[in-house]
């Protein structure tokens, strides 16, 4: 059962409601500082899972080649375009009622949070791990961050933030059930290398959140596809030759 996905979606809805009704009481400094804490939490989650790595060369190769593929096909731009399409659908139901934003600023911010909630490396990784192993801890930890992130964005955008839970659930459920089908073909070593690869994405996401370095996290997503085949290939063919 996709418990983590359900909890994550509910956290966005609850955060959106709280932010829309009570967000005006939060100071700009509070919003900025709490976002920095979110970044540190993401880094900590990443570091903890990187420690599970069993085949470092396979993980590093997957991250480098996967990111190269993502950059070559402009995956980040395509994800933004997809978010723009979602934004147009959502915008038909809820319009900008906040005078602080122009219509363009409202739509651009909405696209940003659609990408953040629906296409982040942490969410994709957490959904796949949840489907493969039943471990919902990544998504539950992400839910805590998303609760407050949704509240902060809802301070400015209003109730529209709650609606982002709908496309998020659809995307994460597809990943969850696909991972469930793949799991019988995996080994414990492949799973650990996959978790470590996801840890690098969470670490990069943390750096972005604290605005220390703008890593291309969306373009790093193909590494999540490469890592398990690469881990299997490394253990089966390369490791016997070098050991």
Language model features: what each stretch is:
Residues 7-15, 19, 23, 39-40, ...:
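Alpha-helical transmembrane segments in multi-pass membrane proteins
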Residues 27, 74-83, 162, 216-217:
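Juxtamembrane/interfacial segments flanking transmembrane helices
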Residues 61, 65-103:
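Glycine/small-residue-rich loop that forms an oxyanion/phosphate-binding "nest" at active or ligand-binding sites
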Residues 21-27, 48-53:
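Short, hydrophobic transmembrane alpha-helix segments
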Residues 231-243:
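Juxtamembrane boundary at the C-terminal end of a transmembrane helix
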Residues 98-163:
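Internal active-site segments that recognize and position negatively charged phosphoryl groups
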Residues 1-14, 61, 127, 131-144, ...:
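Structural signature of hydrophobic alpha-helical transmembrane segments
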Residues 207-226:
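Interfacial loop-to-transmembrane junctions
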């Amino acid at each position: 059962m996709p418990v983590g996905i359900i909890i994550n979606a509910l956290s966005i809805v609850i955060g959106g409601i709280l932010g829309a009704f009570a967000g005006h009481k939060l100071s700009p400094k509070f919003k900025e500082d709490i976002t920095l804490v979110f970044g540190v939490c993401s880094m900590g989650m990443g570091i903890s899972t990187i420690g599970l790595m069993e085949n470092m060369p396979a993980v590093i190769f997957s991250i480098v080649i996967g990111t190269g593929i993502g950059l070559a096909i402009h995956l980040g731009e395509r994800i933004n375009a997809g978010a723009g399409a979602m934004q147009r659908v959502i915008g038909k139901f809820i319009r900008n009622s906040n005078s602080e934003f122009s219509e363009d600023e409202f739509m651009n911010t909405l696209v940003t949070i659609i990408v953040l909630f629906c296409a982040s490396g942490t969410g994709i990784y957490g959904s796949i791990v949840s489907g493969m192993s039943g471990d919902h801890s990544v998504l539950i930890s992400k839910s805590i961050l998303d609760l407050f992130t949704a509240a902060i964005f809802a301070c400015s955008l209003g109730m529209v933030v709650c609606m982002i839970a709908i496309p998020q659930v659809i995307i994460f459920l597809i990943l969850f059930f696909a991972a469930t089908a793949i799991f019988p073909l995996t080994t414990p070593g492949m799973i650990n290398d996959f978790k470590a690869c996801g840890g690098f994405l969470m670490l990069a996401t943390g750096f972005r959140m604290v605005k220390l370095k703008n890593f291309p996290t969306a373009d790093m997503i193909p590494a999540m596809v490469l890592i398990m085949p690469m881990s299997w290939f490394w253990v089966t063919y390369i490791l016997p030759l070098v050991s």
